[in-house]
């Protein structure tokens, strides 16, 4: 029997073609792009690792040492005004400083505060805060303002919460993504953006594992260095020391990208300042309102913030019934962060190919659908005893509080996993074909204010209820929250469909 050489050659060609397609499917980065891609990924890893550590820490401190209900007050009365102030400062900086220096300045301010909180403020918080007797007397005389009194009496915890809340939207959403948008083409963004999370999002899993083992790390450090600090103080210092180290690595990585990795063409694109006459803050907001494209992006951010906040409040309140100290609560958050990291990597692998093969809309609509479905499930368990009883009858969970915590954790894991990958990447892709001036200043308003307005909008409603009805709890207002949640998710789905049309038109116009 003879073998036809042409058949062998054809088979070999088919095999090579198959492996080539498989390689492109898994790793669509071209050889000359590897260094650029990996350095951006390292920068993203550091920023997100910090983000997850301080997010867990702020909730652990505020929820266990003040109360879960205080979060709604902080988000509206503290975080939202700070977001507006930060936007005003950023627009001024854009018109006066180099983009690279803006990055260094803002990162340094955050890191300086975290260092002060870890080693000066928190160890002395009892001395710096109001006395318990004074607080109790004020709350007794002004019961409707008791949460404001708590907020001000524990001012350092409140300030830490506000600063930590600004990090993901100022550093990650604004500084990092604006930098990446300016050095990435539309064609590169389709391959780069979903895959940025493939390595960087492992920071979620590692942060979760770190927090889960915080007690063991604390014991090791105490024995190793014979420290006399209190258990919870040392836990907070350990977390924030890691934050400081990662922050320094992020600054160094950003410097290397600017001076060693990017070529002159990319450096020219890193001019955040518009070439036209500098715009005032009022003109910047007017530009935002005049752009339907930016308004729709802001709508997505607002809806996401409202939907997530409506579920997180009751969920965190339920969690404090079981996890009563900052270290215990941080370990609990670490456990669901670990699962979030695993599912995020899964979404990264699927998401990069969803964008390339099924298009922008399919990738963008997955997150609101996941949030909607899992959120409805949580509220059903939380509000309707018969539904919770059905779960008890079919699963091993028998504690109603544990059922709510578990369903809420599942909701958070799936929502955050899809948000960190599909939602963030498709949102950033929507900015790429825009005019440079709209991309820069419109993005500042949409990202910072849009995100915070979403969280603060629902926070205002919740805080208003707690002011009017001091005895109200998350359980008693949960049905109301569910109705608002449904309306928000339906609006989110509509805005996604409308933005898809705008995105396609912008790409055609830019080509």
Swiss-Prot record:
Entry membrane topology: Multi-pass membrane protein
NCBIfam families assigned: AAA (TIGR00769)
Protein name as it appears in the record: ADP,ATP carrier protein 4
Molecular function terms from GO: ATP binding; ATP:ADP antiporter activity
TM segment ranges: 34-54, 70-90, 102-122, 157-177, 192-212, 231-251, 296-316, 330-350, 361-381, 390-410, 453-473, 476-496
Cell location: Cell membrane
Keyword annotations: ATP-binding, Cell membrane, Membrane, Nucleotide-binding, Transmembrane, Transmembrane helix, Transport
Coiled-coil intervals, chain numbering: none
Presence of keyword Transmembrane: yes
GO cellular component: a single term: plasma membrane
Superkingdom field: Bacteria
Free-text function comment from the UniProt entry: Provides the rickettsial cell with host ATP in exchange for rickettsial ADP. This is an obligate exchange system. This energy acquiring activity is an important component of rickettsial parasitism.
Encoding gene, per UniProt annotation: tlcD
């Amino acid at each position: 029997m003879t073998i036809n050489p042409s058949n062998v050659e054809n088979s070999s060609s088919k095999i090579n073609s198959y492996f080539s397609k498989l390689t492109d499917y898994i790793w669509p980065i071209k050889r000359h792009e590897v260094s650029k891609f990996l350095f951006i990924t390292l920068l993203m890893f550091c920023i997100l690792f910090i983000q997850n550590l301080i997010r867990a820490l702020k909730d652990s401190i505020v929820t266990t040492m003040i109360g879960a209900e205080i979060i709604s007050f902080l988000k509206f009365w503290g975080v939202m005004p700070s977001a507006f102030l930060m936007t005003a400062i950023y627009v001024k900086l854009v018109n006066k400083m180099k983009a690279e220096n803006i990055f260094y300045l803002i990162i340094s301010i955050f890191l300086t505060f975290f260092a002060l909180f870890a080693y000066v403020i928190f160890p002395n918080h009892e001395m710096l805060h109001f006395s318990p007797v004074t607080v109790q007397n004020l709350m007794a005389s002004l019961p409707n303002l008791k949460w404001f009194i708590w907020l001000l009496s524990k001012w350092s915890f409140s300030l830490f919460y506000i600063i930590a809340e600004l990090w993901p939207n100022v550093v990650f959403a604004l500084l990092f993504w604006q930098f990446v948008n300016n050095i990435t083409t539309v064609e590169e963004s389709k391959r780069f953006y979903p895959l940025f999370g493939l390595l960087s999002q492992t920071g979620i899993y590692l942060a979760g594992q770190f927090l889960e083992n915080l007690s063991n790390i604390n014991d090791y450090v105490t024995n190793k260095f014979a420290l006399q600090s209190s258990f919870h103080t040392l836990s907070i210092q350990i977390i924030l020391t890691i934050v400081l180290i990662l922050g320094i690595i992020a600054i160094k990585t950003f410097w290397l990208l600017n001076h060693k990795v990017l070529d002159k063409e990319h450096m020219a694109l890193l001019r955040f300042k518009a070439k036209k006459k500098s715009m005032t803050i009022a003109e910047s907001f007017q530009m935002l309102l005049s752009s339907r494209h930016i308004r729709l992006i802001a709508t997505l951010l607002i809806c996401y913030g409202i939907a997530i906040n409506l579920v997180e409040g009751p969920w965190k309140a339920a969690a404090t019934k079981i996890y009563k100290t900052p270290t215990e609560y941080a370990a609990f958050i670490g456990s669901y962060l670990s699962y979030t990291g695993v599912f995020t990597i899964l979404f990264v692998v699927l998401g990069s190919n969803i964008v390339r093969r099924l298009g922008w809309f399919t990738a963008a609509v997955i997150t609101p659908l996941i949030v909607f479905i899992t959120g409805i499930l949580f509220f059903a368990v939380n509000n309707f005893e018969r539904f919770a009883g059905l779960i008890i009858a079919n699963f091993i969970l028998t504690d109603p509080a544990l059922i709510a915590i578990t369903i809420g954790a599942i909701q958070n894991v799936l929502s955050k996993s899809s948000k960190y990958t599909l939602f963030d990447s498709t949102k950033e892709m929507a900015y790429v074909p825009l005019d440079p001036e709209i991309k820069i200043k419109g993005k500042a308003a949409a990202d910072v204010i849009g995100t915070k307005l979403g969280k603060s909008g629902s926070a205002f409603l919740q805080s208003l209820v707690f002011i009017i009805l001091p005895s109200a709890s998350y359980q008693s207002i949960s049905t109301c929250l569910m109705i608002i949640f449904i309306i928000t998710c339906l609006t989110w789905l509509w805005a996604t469909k409308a933005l898809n049309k705008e995105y396609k038109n912008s790409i055609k116009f830019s080509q």
